[in-house]
Each structure stands twice: as structure tokens, then as C-alpha cells.
């Protein structure tokens, strides 16, 4: 959600900010609705005062034994007019909120310009892709040859973009999630939370998935949606809350199933586990003081990088350009891991600073003791990391010529000391 006061004061700046995202100017429309709403509210306030005054006069006239019918009729007329204006005010509120809810966040000044992902800027890279003495296979070939990935069984059960994992590979995925969670809790200062995977629409509105991206969500019977990411539930833990400034920063992490319809992904990554309807992810969420959110984004990104470093997976960090930053974010770094089977880097984590955009939508605030009023918190979220894609990266980077897969040292304690899959 956007700050109406800021739009009133600097409408040109608001339109220029939207232009960075290749959007048409919207300040005139927003301010017109705002002006109409304020005019109706002023008229309602005036009528309220007239009604109160007339009601007092009715009491005085009746007390003196006079005829108050004219005043009674006047009050009735005022009430009827007010009812119509209140309905009009409700319509204007919904229209204004609808327009504001459909507009993306204002980008940080440091976000690179560009129309799409082709203009993203590499910030740094870590690790050197392994030189194979054989042609590396893709993860689904490895998984099927080890008897640990069954896409046909998943298709019989649920259709396309699902997988059944078995045996050592199922255990490896579980180990990855547990490793990530333990790392963030014990060394990165995050508190583990377990949240529902079913949420109501207001939670999705708060983080920005609704109303604009309804087609990307799975809706179940009743008022529930399956979460596309634990960002939704974990961030909404501060919805409607006023936190003490001393409680900030609040850092939380969750390991959940995630569900996405992949409505715009027809024909993309149709084989394997890169793009699925159901997948596991470890999510990091930070709730911070506005002055600290820029530094927190760097910290969060480093926490996600630490996962890949400890697994010794080569990766690069990309600063997303204006045309590629997500709806709710003001700035985003993507971590892309090297996949030798595809001979390319693929996204495995996205870390974003949303500023006060989500906080305004969900009314998450903080208060400094001794100061008047409250302020909106800043919220950040990041994958720490996508577990399924990390499994893909491990299988491809640690594959051996004999068809086995070496287990990264960081995971062997979670695998009962197992050193190789397929032995």
C-alpha cells in the first residue's frame, strides 16, 4: 500500500517511480478519487453537525411545549442524505483502496534500470564450477537412475509438475531442509516458527499476492488459499500489531510446503523439479526499524549465501533490475546456483526488502517509548533456500561418473554418515 499523503505532496515523483516499472501515471486517478472521498467526508461531517444541532433544538422545543415536527422532518431528511453519502463514501473507499492495492512498491534508488531479467546486474559470484571428465546429467536423469524420483507415479496421483521422492533422495531432501533450518536458527539468529499452510485472503492481501496475482494461487473450498510461500504467514504474524521498538529486529524462519499454480509457466521447465506446483522452502523473514532495512537486506542475503557456501555449491548474486523486481519489493537480490546438467545458473533464492509496503497493507507498526504515535515497520523476506532446487543442485554438482552421487560433508551428519547415494 502507498502513502496517500506522499502522493498528494509529490504526485510527479510517484508517477516517475511507476514509470521505472513500465507503468502508466496513476497519481491523477488516485488523487481524483481521494479528492472525491474527502469532499464526501467533509459533507458528512457538516451534516452530522447539522443533525446534532437540530436534535438539540427538538429537545428544547419539546421541553417548552412547542411543535417540533418541522425539526423532526429536517432530521429525517438529513439522515436520508447521510445514508446516501455514506454509501457513496464506501464506494469511493473501495475504489481508492482497489487502485492502491493494485500498484506495486516504489523501487529503491539503487535498483538498476532495465526492462526485464536480461538487464539484471551480477554483484558477485562464489565458487568455481566443477570441470567434469564426463558429460554431466540433469537431476531428473540422476534421480530416476537411482530409483529416487518417480514422475510417472506423481502424474498418476496429481498430474503434471509433481514428483514422488523415494529412499536416499527423499532422505537427502529432508536433510537439506533440516540443515538450512538449523543453520539459520543456531548461527544466523532466526527464531523458528511453524505456521499454517492454509490462509484467508486478508493475509495474502497483506503481503501483496492478492488481489493482483490470484491466478497464481491454489484456492480450496471455503475462504482458504494454500500458501505460495511462508513469507505470507510469517510476515502476517505482525499484522495489526504494535511492536515495541526494543523488540526489533524480529527475525523468523519457517520450513514449509509451498503451492503455486505456475499459471504463466506453460512450456517452461516441464521436466524435473525446477518448477513444481508443490515444493519445500525454508523462508527467512525480518521485521525491522526503517533505518535498518537496507543493512538487513545485505545480512539476509549473506545468510542465504552461507547455505550454498557450506554445501560448496557455486553461485552468483544478481541485483534485479527495475523491470524484474517483484510487486511487493523495493529491492531484490537473486541467488543463482550453478547447474552443470543445464550448463547455466538458475535461481535458488530471492531476498527482498519491501520497506513499509507490506506493513501499510497489514497495519504492522512499532512504537518508541516516550514518543507520540507509531510508525510502520519495514519487512524483508528471503528464501533460505528453496529446498527442491537445492536438491537439484546437489545431485548435479556432486554426481559421479559411475552414477553415484557424493553427499556434501555438511549433510552427512543428517544422513547417518552416508557418503554416497547409490552405493
UniProtKB/Swiss-Prot annotation:
GO terms for cellular component: cytoplasm. One of its GO terms (biological process) is selenocysteine biosynthetic process. ATP binds at residues 260-262, 347-350. Keywords: Aminoacyl-tRNA synthetase, ATP-binding, Cytoplasm, Ligase, Nucleotide-binding, Protein biosynthesis. It catalyses: tRNA(Ser) + L-serine + ATP = L-seryl-tRNA(Ser) + AMP + diphosphate + H(+); tRNA(Sec) + L-serine + ATP = L-seryl-tRNA(Sec) + AMP + diphosphate + H(+). L-serine binds at residues 229-231, 283, 383. This is Serine--tRNA ligase.
Amino acid at each position: 500500500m502507498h502513502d496517500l499523503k506522499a502522493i498528494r505532496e509529490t504526485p510527479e515523483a510517484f508517477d516517475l517511480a511507476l514509470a521505472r516499472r513500465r507503468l502508466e501515471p496513476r497519481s491523477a486517478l488516485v488523487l481524483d478519487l481521494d479528492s472525491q472521498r474527502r469532499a464526501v467526508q467533509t459533507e458528512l461531517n457538516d451534516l452530522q453537525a447539522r443533525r446534532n444541532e437540530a436534535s438539540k433544538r427538538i429537545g428544547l422545543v419539546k421541553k417548552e411545549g412547542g411543535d417540533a415536527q418541522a425539526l423532526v422532518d429536517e432530521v429525517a431528511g438529513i439522515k436520508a442524505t447521510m445514508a446516501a453519502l455514506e454509501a457513496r463514501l464506501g464506494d469511493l473507499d473501495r475504489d481508492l483502496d482497489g487502485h492502491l492495492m493494485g500498484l506495486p512498491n516504489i523501487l529503491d534508488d539503487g535498483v538498476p534500470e532495465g526492462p526485464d531479467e536480461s538487464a539484471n546486474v551480477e554483484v558477485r559470484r562464489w565458487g568455481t564450477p566443477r570441470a567434469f571428465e564426463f558429460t554431466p546429467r540433469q537431476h531428473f536423469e540422476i534421480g530416476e537412475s537411482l530409483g529416487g524420483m518417480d514422475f510417472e507415479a506423481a502424474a498418476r496421483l496429481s498430474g503434471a509438475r509433481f514428483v514422488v521422492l523415494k529412499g536416499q533422495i527423499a532422505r537427502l531432501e529432508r536433510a537439506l531442509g533440516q540443515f538450512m533450518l538449523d543453520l539459520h536458527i543456531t548461527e544466523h539468529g532466526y527464531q523458528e516458527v511453524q505456521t499454517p499452510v492454509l490462509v484467508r485472503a486478508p493475509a495474502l492481501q497483506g503481503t501483496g499476492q492478492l488481489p493482483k496475482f490470484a491466478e497464481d494461487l491454489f484456492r480450496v473450498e471455503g475462504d482458504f488459499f494454500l500458501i505460495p510461500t511462508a513469507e505470507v504467514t510469517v510476515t502476517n504474524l505482525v499484522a495489526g500489531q504494535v511492536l515495541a521498538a526494543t523488540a526489533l529486529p524480529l527475525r523468523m524462519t519457517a520450513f514449509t510446503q509451498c503451492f503455486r499454480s505456475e499459471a504463466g509457466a506453460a512450456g517452461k521447465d516441464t521436466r524435473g523439479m525446477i518448477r513444481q506446483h508443490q515444493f519445500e522452502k525454508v523462508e527467512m523473514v525480518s521485521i525491522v526499524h526503517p533505518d535498518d532495512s537496507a543493512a538487513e537486506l545485505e545480512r539476509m542475503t549473506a545468510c542465504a549465501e552461507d547455505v550454498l557456501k557450506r554445501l560448496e555449491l557455486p553461485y552468483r548474486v544478481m541485483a534485479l533490475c527495475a523491470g524484474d523486481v517483484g510487486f511487493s519489493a523495493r529491492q531484490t537480490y537473486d541467488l543463482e546456483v550453478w547447474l552443470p546438467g543445464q550448463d547455466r545458473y538458475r535461481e535458488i533464492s530471492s531476498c527482498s526488502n519491501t520497506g513499509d509496503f507490506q506493513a501499510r497493507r497489514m497495519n504492522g507498526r512499532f512504537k518508541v517509548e516516550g514518543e507520540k504515535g507509531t510508525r510502520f515497520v519495514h519487512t524483508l523476506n528471503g528464501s533460505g533456500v528453496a529446498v527442491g532446487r537445492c536438491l537439484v543442485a546437489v545431485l548435479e554438482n556432486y554426481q559421479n561418473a559411475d552414477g553415484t552421487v557424493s553427499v556434501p560433508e555438511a549433510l552427512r551428519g543428517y544422513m547417518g554418515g552416508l557418503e554416497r547415494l547409490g552405493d
